[in-house]
UniProtKB/Swiss-Prot annotation:
Gene3D superfamilies: Winged helix-like DNA-binding domain superfamily/Winged helix DNA-binding domain. GO terms for biological process: regulation of DNA-templated transcription; transcription initiation at RNA polymerase II promoter. Residues 5-89 form the HTH TFE/IIEalpha-type domain. Monomer. Interaction with RNA polymerase subunits RpoF and RpoE is necessary for Tfe stimulatory transcription activity. Able to interact with Tbp and RNA polymerase in the absence of DNA promoter. Interacts both with the preinitiation and elongation complexes. Belongs to the TFE family. InterPro entries: TF_E_archaea, TFE, TFIIE/TFIIEa_HTH, TFIIE_asu, TFIIEa/SarR/Rpc3_HTH_dom, WH-like_DNA-bd_sf, WH_DNA-bd_sf. The keyword Transcription applies. This is Transcription factor E.
């Protein structure tokens, strides 16, 4: 796994499960092997109950997976945890699709609207807001200036195309590897 992919995974994990569980995911990514919760707790010098909470959280979000076996002596279940690479790739792909959807919506909004901004406060207003305030900044009273959103539209077009290409490439790559 590339360091860029790992960064994306950890960033997504931080958003979904918080910093502590993300540190555990980082540990498991480095290990690249199946480990029991007891082994993880020993290596990290953390109580096994704390490790289990984080493991369950990571598992709920699809970052890790486990298999369980029964200990022949005690009859208790032993859980072996590992990073779920296939699921993580799907999570990243879905996140990119969501970002793409938002960028397309923003592009349509930019395309279909006129904007004005206050040069003093650098606050942007759509046409209706500007008209309602008689083309004056409601905060400072300065006259609003027309905002040419051409650069914004070009940037959004570029990012949309870039993400569409990434999704297509990763979808094609993913379907070839299965």
């Amino acid at each position: 796994m590339s360091s860029r992919a790992e960064e994306l995974i950890l960033s997504l994990a931080k958003d979904l499960v918080g910093e502590d569980a993300t540190e555990l995911l980082k540990f498991l990514l480095r290990k690249r092997i199946e480990m029991t919760d007891d082994d993880i707790a020993k290596e990290l010098n953390v109580k096994v109950n704390e490790i289990r909470k984080k493991l369950y959280l990571l598992s709920e979000q699809g970052f890790i997976t486990y298999r369980k076996t029964r200990d022949k002596e005690t009859g208790l279940f032993i859980y072996y945890w590992k990073v779920n690479i296939d699921q993580i790739n799907e999570l990243l792909l879905n996140r990119k699709r969501l970002v793409l959807e938002k960028l397309k919506a923003r592009y349509e909004q930019e395309k279909d609207s006129l904007y004005y901004y206050c040069p003093q406060d650098n606050i942007q207003y759509n046409f209706d807001e500007a008209l309602e305030n008689e083309f004056k900044c409601p905060k400072c009273g300065s006259p609003l200036e027309y905002y040419d959103s051409e650069k914004t539209k070009k940037f959004l077009e570029y990012k949309i195309k870039q993400i569409e290409n990434e999704i297509e490439r990763e979808t094609r790559h993913g379907s070839n590897s299965r």
